[in-house]
Structures are given as structure tokens and as C-alpha cells.
């Protein structure tokens, strides 16, 4: 069994796309998989309760499929920072509670388990703890999703430094092209783009698990399978 914590350089860096893509890739190889999203805001009200699209995407790529409450125990409606959403809801998570909750899913020892954070590495869980503390408590290697956009070199390097400062290994990183301006319609643009990737490869000092381009796939499931085509599982890089 291998478990990783997935974080990103920013809120919309592409954590769920990459995590679901890695799970889809593992399933292609016949491996058992599990994706967890312990804390999520921006959830929608359904007849079955609050549901988060990112958590549902991870659930769809988990095999065997777990109950929703297993992978997303703290679901909040407001699309704001999780600790603020939790305060509004009057249901504030703690690291002790999260560690206790993930104990049973992790005990299943699936071939690949990914725990996706919220936002970036330093996003607060509550007034006193960061969500990154879950990875620290569980001593998990980290996969960093780098949103490829202007400023990503600084964001990526600071994130990697913070992860290592917390005593955790950076198992790998994935570049996700989120800025449509980073196209290579001109030769000069492509050269700059390639230089950015080379700088990330040199300075992050961790394996690159793939570069995901902008995908045309419409549904989360289709996007997960499309992303899988550009990814490598940790340990294979």
C-alpha cells in the first residue's frame, strides 16, 4: 500500500484533476485505489446531503467505491476558505478528528491512496492548525500540483520549501497548464514555456510525474481519464 498527500500551489492549481488522473492510471493497471477529500467547501445541497464535485470525482476513481461520508467527512456549502466555512457551519474539524477518521480507510491498505488537501499547503484547518498537519501527522510523502501560469516558479518553490520544512518528502510534482496565455503559438513563447519547465525540474529536486495540457474533455470522469494519459505513477518516474 502507498499513500500520498496531494497539495497544490494554489486553490485552482488542478489537485483534483491530477489526483483523479493518477487514480485512473492506477486502475488501468488493475490496482485498488482510494481518493480522500477530508475537508471541502463549495458543496452543493442534494437529497443525500452536501456533496462536493471534487470529492465525487475522487469517489468515481476509487475502486472499490467507498461511501461518500468515508472520503469527505467535513463538507461545507459556502465556497470560501474551509476554516471560515467550518466556522459558519459551527462544525470545526481538528487534526485529531481527521486522523481518527482516515484511520479506517487507510487500514484497507489499497494499492494507491491519495488524500487531497484544500487550496495550498498553508491553508488553515481551524484557528490553530493547518490542513497540512494531517500529512505531517501521518508522515505522508507529498505530491505537488503546480498550476502552470505566470508566477508559478515562485509559488512552486515556496510550496516545496514549506513541505520539506515540515519534515516531509516531496515524492513528485505535476505541472497543470491552467493559463491559456501560456500557449506556444510563437517560437519564443514555446521557448519560455520550456525554460519554465526546466527551471521547475531543476529547482524542485523531485521527479516530474507529468505535464497535463489544457483538456477538452467535458465531464470530470472523462477529464480524469484524459489526464491519466499524461501522468506517471509515483515510483515509476
Curated annotation (Swiss-Prot):
Binding residues annotated for substrate, in chain numbering: 41
What NCBIfam families does the entry give? bioD (TIGR00347)
As recorded in Swiss-Prot or TrEMBL, the protein's gene is named bioD
- Name one cellular component (GO) term: cytosol
- The entry's protein name is ATP-dependent dethiobiotin synthetase BioD
Q: What class of enzyme is it?
A: ligase
Lineage of source species: Bacteria, Pseudomonadati, Pseudomonadota, Gammaproteobacteria, Oceanospirillales
Family stated for the protein in its record: Belongs to the dethiobiotin synthetase family.
Binding of ATP: at which residues?
Answer: 12-17, 54, 116-119, 213-215
Q: How does it assemble?
A: Homodimer.
The record places the active site at 37
Tell me which InterPro entries the record gives.
Answer: DTB_synth_BioD, P-loop_NTPase
The pathway to which it is assigned is: Cofactor biosynthesis; biotin biosynthesis; biotin from 7,8-diaminononanoate: step 1/2
Which organism is this protein's natural source?
Answer: Chromohalobacter salexigens (strain ATCC BAA-138 / DSM 3043 / CIP 106854 / NCIMB 13768 / 1H11)
Amino acid at each position: 500500500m502507498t499513500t500520498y498527500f496531494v497539495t497544490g500551489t494554489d486553490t485552482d492549481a488542478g489537485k483534483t484533476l491530477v489526483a483523479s488522473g493518477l487514480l485512473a492510471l492506477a486502475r488501468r493497471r488493475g490496482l485498488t485505489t482510494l481518493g480522500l477529500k477530508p475537508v471541502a467547501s463549495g458543496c452543493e445541497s442534494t437529497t443525500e446531503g452536501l456533496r462536493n464535485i471534487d470529492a465525487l470525482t475522487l469517489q468515481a476513481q476509487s475502486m472499490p467505491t467507498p461511501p461518500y461520508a468515508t472520503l469527505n467527512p467535513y463538507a461545507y456549502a459556502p465556497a470560501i476558505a474551509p476554516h471560515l466555512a467550518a466556522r459558519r457551519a459551527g462544525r470545526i474539524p481538528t487534526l485529531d478528528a481527521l486522523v481518527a477518521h482516515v484511520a479506517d480507510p487507510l487500514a484497507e491498505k489499497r494499492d494507491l491512496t491519495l488524500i487531497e488537501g484544500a487550496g495550498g499547503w498553508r491553508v488553515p484547518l481551524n484557528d490553530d492548525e493547518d490542513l497540512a498537519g494531517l500529512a505531517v501527522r501521518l508522515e505522508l510523502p507529498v505530491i505537488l500540483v503546480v498550476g502552470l501560469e505566470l508566477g508559478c516558479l515562485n509559488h512552486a518553490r515556496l510550496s516545496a520549501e514549506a513541505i520539506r520544512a515540515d519534515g516531509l518528502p516531496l515524492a513528485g510534482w505535476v505541472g497543470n497548464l491552467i493559463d491559456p496565455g501560456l500557449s506556444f503559438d510563437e517560437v519564443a513563447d514555446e521557448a519560455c514555456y520550456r525554460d519554465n519547465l526546466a527551471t521547475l525540474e531543476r529547482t524542485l529536486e523531485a521527479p516530474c510525474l507529468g505535464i497535463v495540457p489544457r483538456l477538452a474533455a467535458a465531464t470530470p470522469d472523462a477529464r480524469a481519464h484524459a489526464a491519466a494519459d499524461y501522468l506517471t505513477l509515483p515510483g515509476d518516474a
